[in-house]
Amino acid sequence: MKNRILPILFILFFILPVQAKREPDLYKKADSQRMEHWVDSVFDSMSVKERIGQLFVLAVDVNTSAKNKELIRKYVEEYKVGGLLFTSGDVQKQAELTNYAQSLAKIPLMITMDGEWGLAMRLKNTTKFPINMTLGAIRNDSLIYAYGKEMGRQCRRMGIQVNFAP
């Protein structure tokens, strides 16, 4: 009996947990290879200055003035930044500036925001979500999931890839 229990315990405690931690395949192998090839070819074509610039995300005001557009141009074309973090403003101006910045970039920019309460934390006339302390008190996981999904949908519509929200 002991001889049968040890292999079963080994499987339960060592093999099954390893299998449970496997990441799901989000992309097909062909897609992954194509993406890696593109990334490698772009990276190999970059200068040291461009590679260093990709490490930086710089804050920009949501203001469509000529002075602000010149600042964005300088960040993108001269400093070769990897992304921008837009501060307060309105939806239309941010969309305009995002499109402007992306049009200048040799490599697509990572557009970010600091919006713990959703877009309303930085952009006027958008949906304001509850603060995180309130969310912590909610005992309905499906509601929290729906909250996160909606916040992600709104960010995606604005071209925001990263929301620095805990």
Set out the residue ranges of the language-model regions.
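Alpha-helical transmembrane segments and their juxtamembrane interfaces
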Residues: 12-14, 55, 124
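Enzymes and membrane/adaptor proteins characterized by extended Gly/Ser/Thr/Asp/Glu-rich
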Residues: 61-69, 73-166
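Bacterial Sec-dependent N-terminal signal peptides
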Residues: 1-24
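Short, flexible, solvent-exposed loop/turn segments with mixed acidic/basic and small polar residues
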Residues: 4-5, 46-48, 71-77
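Short, structurally constrained coil/turn elements
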Residues: 14, 51, 104-105
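Mature N-terminal segment immediately following signal peptide/propeptide cleavage
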Residues: 31-64
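N-terminal targeting or signal-anchor segments and their processing/structural boundaries
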Residues: 19-35
